[in-house]
């Protein structure tokens, strides 16, 4: 594991931390402050990749184990503009001095000694220069690394703000997509307004005006948040641009601050050392040798060759070291400017973060609360269903509770009666004892278990009906399934009392637990007795202790008394006494010995006891230390888990952000492809337009060429006439000239007519130049024939001038007027005024045609849309909107005839209601058709005359004609058949397909609008389908349609 280094961002100096251990974060900061001369409060520590090192994340051993290599130390003062920063060099370089031998004319020992001293000093300077170059190179690299780390820190800080901003934007977008403010109106009207519970609608639970106020506040707050987030987005984009510019500035600093540390320096230093060694060797030989001629020549060679080289190398090293120091100072100044820009950018990011964490967060919280209030509208059907299910469950529980209460109340009453009888019997026999003792004989006469008040009664059928209402309104499968599952759970609700078997089983478990606890206590007691040696039994392990005790209890007197009890001979007794005395002495020695041993053992025992007490104290201290360490360890583990969770969350956010970037990239690619395709289409359109323009230009060019040819031919003719002109004018030549002038005038007159036919007029501007202008209404007075040329020329002043000129020169013989006329015509046609005007007019007409084509297309779409909204009354096709009316069903009985069945499908019967003829007003087809086709929003009955609407007084309970009444004379039931109203071709019948959904939907309605989805054609034959008994060869259609009854 490499050692960790502290790197100063101000000077680029590094310091190793391999053998230094800092138990606290404050010790590390104090060490950095003392090492780099930075105030303790101004120290900022950053890890690689821009992570800030804080007190909570400091653990020296852990960081060393994880392989931390660098810690970057920043001075907060360099981020302040008010504090002037000036880099201070650590040392001063001195320029190498020239060799003393260079200026000396004679070679002696003093010069050689001074030269050797100069050589040693120069060698030391060169080595110092080499070290300065290397250290400066490393310092510059570290300074650039510090700049990179600081930009990474700014990037991380900005990333946190961007994540916070994106989270708010995503939340707001989700509210826009799924918020209740966009759905509650339709839900309130279509769902809550159609669900009826307890004789009221669910919509009556809310105050509509309050909901509207909440919606207005949500929209107002949403607009404010959008405006604020847009402003913050601009600030974030500006910060991103600033960060990009800072990265570019740092790259420029890296490019412009290249400090080379190549091998040339090492080679020069090695060469310098070789030459210095040679000079030193020759100098020593010159001092020692008697004959100095050879050494003098060699020394002269060194003086003229090697000494200048040494001076050149030292000067080069000095210059390079000076340049590197200047480069380092420049890098420090540029990085200080960079750090100031970083501080400004961070301040703007902090302002954005402050707004996001305060204002935006508060508004988001309020917006969320308001959305929750509106979401109650969407959740009310489900919550009301859960409310009904809970009432149903409580009702089931109450019923079961009542049953159990009745059962146990009767059982307890029997027990109470038995106890009362037992006490009465006892008091009857031993009543006299109550005079001495206080005996409580009071018992309640009956057992009373309080009942629970009845809840609101809810039946299962009511819940199912409510669920069916929700299903009919297409509320959603998850809600329906949830309510059904809750109903199933409520039906499983039960109430059980604990039995005697359960109580006895619990008691047995408690007893088993007590037994296990007693066994554990016995084991602990046995262990305690095992450690007390005095309580051991007398056996092998306790034998020595028992013998010592016996020895201590026996005394000399007792032994003498025992010896005196025997009656022995005197000699033997003397011998025995001597022996006893010896034994006594031995025993005294043993006693003294054992007493000393006992004292030693007691001393050792006291020492051991004191050591034991000390060890107990140390053990308690260690235990307390271990407790504190465990607490710190648990805290560190929690912090590590929090750190890992935070890193995982950041990783997930980064993945999400990366996924969103990929999606945006794909979207941009698709937009690029779409733009490229549109560009290709535009290029094709441009090419088509260019082709059309080229075609028109070719046509105009051809016309101009033809006119030019005519003019040229006329010029040639005139020239020929002028050449062949003689003094006497021939009559035929004059006639031919007049014919040419007439032709030229006709060409001019045709050109004027062409211009007039496309709305152009030849005229002059204020300067007298020819011009062709657009005149509105010019084409109204023209006809397609050439007879109106004079009328078109009458509106052109120039045309009138040329006409008058042409008329005036018809009978003139002089050549000059004719030449002026030709020149005037040539000037008129020579500048291509006619061609450019015609081409420009054609382009205007083409653009106008495109505009009209677009307007016609829009009109076509409007006509198609209006055609789709119109009611079709003949030639029906799928997709047409048709009027459906019920057919009089009297002829649908089994005994009806063919003629009556045919009459039931007439145009008048098709407009009859579902009631019978005797039970409803005779509504005429023209009345209903006029009501529908006129677009009236009122019902059909409102458009029927009163004389027709009041013919039938028989109505059912709903106020509608009773369609399914049973005729008292005939018990056969009547069926409703719906058909399409047709204005023409009543021979073809269009009948609605007999499906339960359609007829349930159209129940109790007099008319309906439907869009045809399918037509099935039938022709009545012998084997064909004929449920209505149409005549043979009758064509009828079975129709499927969609109805929108709202």
UniProtKB/Swiss-Prot annotation:
It comes from the Eukaryota. One of its GO terms (cellular component) is Atg1/ULK1 kinase complex. Its main location: membrane. It is found in: Preautophagosomal structure membrane; Vacuole membrane. One of its GO terms (biological process) is autophagy of mitochondrion. It holds the Pfam family ATG17_like. GO terms for molecular function: molecular adaptor activity; protein kinase binding. The keyword Protein transport applies. InterPro entries: ATG11, Atg11_C, ATG17-like_dom. It is a peripheral membrane protein. Keywords: Autophagy, Coiled coil, Membrane, Protein transport, Transport, Vacuole. Residues 582-730 form a coiled coil. Involved in cytoplasm to vacuole transport (Cvt), pexophagy, mitophagy and nucleophagy. Recruits mitochondria for their selective degradation via autophagy (mitophagy) during starvation. Works as scaffold proteins that recruit ATG proteins to the pre-autophagosome (PAS), the site of vesicle/autophagosome formation. Required for the Cvt vesicles completion. Homodimer. PANTHER family: RB1-INDUCIBLE COILED-COIL, RB1-INDUCIBLE COILED-COIL PROTEIN 1. Belongs to the ATG11 family. This is Autophagy-related protein 11. It comes from Kluyveromyces lactis (strain ATCC 8585 / CBS 2359 / DSM 70799 / NBRC 1267 / NRRL Y-1140 / WM37). The gene is ATG11.
């Amino acid at each position: 594991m490499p050692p960790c280094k502290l790197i100063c961002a101000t000077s680029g100096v590094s310091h190793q931390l391999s053998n230094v251990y800092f138990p606290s974060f404050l010790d590390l900061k104090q060490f950095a402050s003392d090492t780099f001369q930075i105030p303790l409060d101004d120290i900022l520590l950053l890890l690689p990749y821009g992570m800030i090192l804080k007190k909570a994340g400091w653990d020296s051993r852990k960081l060393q184990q994880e392989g931390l290599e660098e810690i970057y130390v920043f001075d907060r003062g360099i981020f302040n503009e008010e504090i002037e920063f000036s880099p201070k060099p650590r040392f001063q370089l001195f320029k190498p001095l020239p060799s003393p031998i260079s200026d000396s004319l004679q070679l002696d020992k003093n010069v050689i000694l001074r030269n050797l001293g100069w050589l040693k000093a120069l060698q030391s300077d060169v080595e110092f220069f080499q070290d300065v170059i290397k250290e400066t190179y490393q310092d510059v690299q570290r300074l650039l690394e510090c700049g990179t780390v600081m930009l990474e820190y700014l990037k991380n800080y900005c990333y946190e703000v961007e994540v916070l901003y994106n989270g708010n934007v995503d939340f707001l977008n989700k509210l826009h997509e799924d918020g209740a403010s966009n759905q509650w109106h339709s839900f309130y009207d279509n769902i809550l307004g159609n669900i009826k519970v307890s004789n009221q609608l669910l919509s009556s639970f809310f105050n509509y005006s309050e909901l509207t106020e909440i919606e207005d506040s949500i929209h107002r707050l949403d607009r404010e948040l959008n405006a604020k987030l847009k402003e913050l987005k601009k600030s974030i984009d500006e910060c991103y641009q600033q960060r990009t510019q800072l990265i570019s500035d740092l790259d420029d600093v890296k490019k412009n601050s290249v400090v080379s540390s190549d091998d040339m320096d090492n080679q020069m230093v090695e060469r310098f050392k070789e030459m210095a060694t040679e000079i030193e060797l020759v100098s020593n030989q010159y001092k020692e040798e008697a004959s100095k001629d050879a050494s003098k020549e060699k020394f002269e060679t060194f003086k003229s060759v090697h000494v200048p080289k040494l001076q050149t190398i030292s000067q080069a090293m000095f210059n390079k070291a000076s340049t590197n120091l200047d480069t380092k100072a420049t890098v420090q100044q540029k990085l200080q400017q960079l750090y100031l820009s970083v501080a400004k950018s961070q301040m703007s990011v902090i302002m954005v973060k402050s707004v996001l964490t305060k204002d935006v967060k508060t508004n988001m919280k309020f917006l969320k609360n308001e959305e929750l209030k509106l979401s109650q509208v969407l959740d009310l059907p489900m919550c009301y269903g859960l409310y009904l299910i809970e009432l149903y469950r409580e009702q089931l529980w109450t019923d079961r509770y009542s049953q159990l209460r009745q059962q146990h109340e009767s059982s307890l009453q029997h027990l109470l009666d038995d106890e009362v009888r037992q006490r009465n019997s006892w008091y009857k026999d031993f009543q006299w004892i109550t005079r001495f003792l206080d005996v409580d004989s009071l018992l309640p006469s009956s057992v009373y278990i309080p009942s629970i008040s009845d809840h609101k009664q809810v039946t299962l059928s009511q819940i199912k009906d409510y669920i069916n209402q929700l299903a009919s309104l297409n509320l959603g499968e998850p809600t329906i399934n949830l309510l059904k599952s809750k109903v199933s759970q409520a039906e499983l609700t039960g109430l059980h009392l604990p039995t005697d078997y359960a109580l006895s089983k619990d008691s047995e478990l408690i007893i088993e637990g007590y037994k296990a606890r007693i066994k554990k206590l016995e084991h602990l007691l046995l262990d305690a007795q095992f450690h007390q040696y005095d309580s051991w039994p007398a056996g092998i392990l306790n034998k020595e202790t028992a013998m010592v005790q016996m020895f201590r209890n026996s005394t000399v007197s007792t032994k003498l008394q025992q010896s005196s009890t025997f009656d022995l001979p005197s000699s033997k007794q003397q011998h025995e006494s001597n022996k006893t005395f010896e034994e006594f002495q031995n025993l005294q020695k043993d006693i003294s010995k054992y007493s000393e041993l006992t004292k030693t053992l007691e001393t050792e025992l006291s020492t051991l006891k004191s050591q034991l007490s000390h060890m107990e104290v140390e053990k308690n201290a260690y235990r307390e230390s271990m407790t504190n360490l465990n607490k710190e360890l648990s805290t560190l583990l929690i912090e590590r888990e929090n750190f890992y969770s935070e890193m995982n969350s950041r990783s997930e956010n980064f993945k999400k952000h990366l996924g969103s970037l990929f999606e945006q990239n794909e979207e941009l690619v698709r937009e690029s492809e779409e733009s490229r395709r549109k560009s290709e289409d535009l290029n094709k359109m441009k090419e088509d337009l260019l082709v059309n323009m080229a075609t028109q230009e070719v046509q105009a060019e051809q016309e101009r060429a033809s006119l030019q040819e005519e003019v040229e031919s006329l010029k040639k003719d005139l020239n020929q006439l002028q050449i062949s002109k003689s003094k006497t004018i021939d009559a035929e030549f004059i006639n031919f000239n007049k014919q040419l002038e007439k032709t030229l005038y006709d060409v001019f007159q045709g050109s004027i007519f062409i211009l007039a036919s496309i709305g152009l007029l030849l005229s002059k501007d204020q300067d007298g130049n020819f011009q062709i202008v657009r005149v509105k209404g010019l084409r109204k007075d023209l006809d397609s024939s050439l007879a109106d040329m004079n009328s078109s020329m009458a509106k052109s002043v120039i045309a009138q001038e040329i006409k008058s000129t042409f008329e005036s020169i018809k009978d003139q013989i002089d050549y000059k007027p004719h030449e002026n006329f030709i020149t005037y015509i040539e000037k008129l046609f020579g500048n291509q005024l006619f061609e450019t005007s015609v081409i420009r007019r054609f382009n205007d007409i083409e653009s106008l045609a495109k505009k009209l084509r677009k307007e016609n297309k829009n009109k076509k779409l409007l006509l198609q849309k209006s055609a789709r909204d119109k009611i079709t009354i003949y030639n029906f096709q799928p997709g047409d909107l048709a009027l459906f009316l019920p057919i009089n069903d009297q002829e649908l009985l089994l005994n009806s005839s063919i003629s009556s069945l045919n009459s039931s499908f007439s145009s008048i019967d098709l407009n009859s209601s579902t009631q019978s003829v005797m039970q409803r007003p005779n509504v005429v087809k023209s009345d209903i058709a006029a009501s529908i086709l006129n677009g009236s929003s009122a019902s059909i009955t409102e458009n029927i005359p009163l004389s027709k609407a009041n013919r039938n007084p028989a109505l059912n309970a709903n106020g509608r004609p009773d369609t399914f009444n049973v005729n008292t004379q005939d018990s056969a039931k009547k069926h409703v058949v719906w058909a399409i109203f047709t204005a023409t071709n009543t021979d073809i019948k269009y009948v609605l397909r007999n499906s339960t959904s359609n007829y349930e939907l159209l129940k109790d309605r007099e008319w309906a609008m439907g869009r045809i989805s399918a037509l099935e054609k039938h022709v009545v034959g012998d084997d064909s389908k004929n449920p209505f008994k149409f005549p043979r060869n009758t064509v009828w259609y079975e129709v499927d349609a969609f109805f929108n009854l709202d």
